[in-house]
Amino acid sequence: MRPSNRTPAQSRPVTITRQFTAHAEGSVLVEFGDTKVLCTASFEEGVPRFLKGQGQGWVTAEYGMLPRSTHSRMQREAARGKQSGRTQEIQRLIGRSLRAAVDMKLLGENTIVIDCDVIQADGGTRTAAITGACVALVDALNWARGKGILKTNPLKFLIAAVSVGIYKGEPICDLEYIEDSAAETDMNVVMTETGKIIEIQGTAEGEPFSHEELLSLLELAKHGIREIVDIQKASLS
């Protein structure tokens, strides 16, 4: 039995609130249960130096957690003077995932900067961030088209992400913190709206997992992501 009494395949309630802030071209508050992440997408002219003159754009991401997003206060990374390895890993994951969804040639020499700030953490912050950032990205691209900056929509497909894992010997979907901290296997999966895989991050925290367990986890993720994409589409309609 899961602590929340959810079934193994059941995700937490997912809520996507668009236009959450006034200034960003795209802004979303995404909630996976008690995990809440603010995702903004800023449209900027120009590209990093390594892309100048190549006629293509760039999508990059930054990620952070507010000091009291967790049970006890954590020091701001700015105050420490450096980002943790975890932060760098997550923001690279978000950027890679979103770049897979965008035709960089159609974006032109423009950059979209995604900022994901965790307001409250209860497991699955990176998967929530990817899911919300995708919707913010769509709004930023639509803003650019409305301004005449882009003639064609560079978005190839929606993407979403969910965590899966083995908890007390059973494969489950969308782990909250109490499950994540005790899971024998922990995995984050990013997929397109058609179920194609963009990224898998999987680790055996305790006992190694079998090929059969891997396949069952991927099926759980595919089912969960399909439901999340439906919520993304409903929020954009």
Swiss-Prot record:
Molecular function, one GO term: 3'-5'-RNA exonuclease activity
Binding residue positions for phosphate: R86, G124, T125, R126
Stored SUPFAM superfamilies: Ribonuclease PH domain 2-like, Ribosomal protein S5 domain 2-like
Catalytic activity: tRNA(n+1) + phosphate = tRNA(n) + a ribonucleoside 5'-diphosphate
Keyword RNA-binding: yes
Annotated coiled-coil segments of the chain: none
Alphabetical list of Gene3D superfamilies matching this protein: GHMP Kinase, N-terminal domain
CDD domains associated with the record: RNase_PH_bact
InterPro entries: ExoRNase_PH_dom1, ExoRNase_PH_dom2, ExoRNase_PH_dom2_sf, PNPase/RNase_PH_dom_sf, Ribosomal_Su5_D2-typ_SF, RNase_PH, RNase_PH_bac-type, RNase_PH_CS
Pfam family, one: RNase_PH_C
Gene Ontology terms describing biological process: rRNA catabolic process; rRNA processing; tRNA processing
The enzyme's E.C. designation: 2.7.7.56
Record PROSITE patterns: RIBONUCLEASE_PH
Alphabetical keyword list: Nucleotidyltransferase, RNA-binding, rRNA processing, Transferase, tRNA processing, tRNA-binding
Family as reported in the entry's similarity comment: Belongs to the RNase PH family.
NCBIfam families: RNasePH (TIGR01966)
PANTHER family recorded: EXOSOME COMPLEX COMPONENT, EXOSOME COMPLEX COMPONENT RRP41
Function noted in UniProt: Phosphorolytic 3'-5' exoribonuclease that plays an important role in tRNA 3'-end maturation. Removes nucleotide residues following the 3'-CCA terminus of tRNAs; can also add nucleotides to the ends of RNA molecules by using nucleoside diphosphates as substrates, but this may not be physiologically important. Probably plays a role in initiation of 16S rRNA degradation (leading to ribosome degradation) during starvation.
Subunit (UniProt): Homohexameric ring arranged as a trimer of dimers.
Name of the featured protein: Ribonuclease PH
Source organism per UniProt: Shewanella halifaxensis (strain HAW-EB4)
Gene: rph
